[in-house]
Amino acid sequence: MPVLLAVGTQNKYYHLGKGIVVLMECSLRFSLAGPDGMTIKADDAKARLEVDSLSLVANDGTSHFFSLRDIVTTRSQDFRIEATMVNGQSLVLFKIGDKYEDLAKGINRSRNEQLIRDLLMQEPVRKQSVPGELRMGAHEEQKPLICKCEVRVYQSTVAIMPEKGEFIRLPLSNLAGVSVEKFSLTIRKEDGSFLTVGKLGRELEPLRKAIADGMAEQTLRIKALLKDLVPEADPINIENASRLIKEGKAVNLVLLDQLVPGSWMAMEKRLEGADLGPQYQLLTSLGIKEKTRVGIKRTRSEEGTTDYIWLFVPITSTSSGKAGNAIAFEASSEDDTGRATYFFRIAPREEFRRSGAEGESFADLDRILDRTNAALEAINFRREPIYLEEGKLYTPEYSRYRYAMMKVPELRDLRARFIGRVIHSDPLQWATDVSDLLSFNVSAKDDDQRWAKKEGEPNE
């Protein structure tokens, strides 16, 4: 079913049949230019904004169709709406009359809704949209940015959609707290920054509660996981650990064991139970065991509780048979099928050839592990956006990933560092393929080269 959106102060949308929902129509003039800046077409036209597209029917009978996923940036100013496309074309809409504000807001809102659908992948909603006024950079020495917005709370994320500009995603695991201050909602992030939403009216307290409840539920899940992992653990240790361990973020096994003694051994047993034992043993024998990170995310559904477990193992050795410059990402859940191990470069290949594990990239390995985790969190741990070939991103089936890649720099970085994936066939074949991939990685010259199984050895 299509998503129905309201544009402007009056909910004017209508159906054209076959699932097409028109948000608004208006007359205007447009100018379309190519990547070289030369005008391709300029004419008066009738514009039609739909849930996922903008179309123009010119006076001479020609038409132009623009998917919202193909629009990279928009800017509305001085009664003109300017948009740049993924193919380098630029579009200017003007002479819109009294529909200017509605069209500008409608395009921005529709693009934000599209991006939310693409990134959050149908994640359940805790609290439906609440209108308010966003204040950012509200420090004494800064002039705050103020604009109207909508706030929506999902299962693991707070989404803020400014009236002008792209939506702001705030994972609950990145939040330090939420409070009511001077009749406004203040959301504080772990990095020390914050933003404020005012003019919420009667929705102020319900919105605060929805965010606070989501944060509390995540913390309780972490505590339950730790207690389940080490039943004899001291409650004080679990309480202290829950302040540092966040859902969706992998934690160093050494640190975890310091916070909750016995958790390292218990986690190894848990990995064995999740059929990750052989992978864990081999990868940590190749990599730096004390730098290994593990993450657990517990999800609940009608079928019961599922633990999603993942590993990051940095492999940095330059010795024969263990050549590294890679981070191994291994993941599984109880209902997972078609498992694979994913590998990402740590350093540019030229740097590794020149300096080995003494290069500057390896000196900041923890930051690179953090960056890899953040990228996976940004795409809700979906793996398809990582390994799909560039050409497939332009097919209708995977267009949502193309839009996400344009808008999420962490995903672009992850794809740029992606070496390849090794499918779990049988243990011996998997180990052979891992060795082959690592050897390829240290011998390849260009950073954009990816590993693939030899012809006749399917990796699907």
Predicted segment positions?
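Eukaryotic intrinsically disordered, low-complexity regulatory linkers and tails enriched in Ser/Thr/Pro
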Residues: 3-460
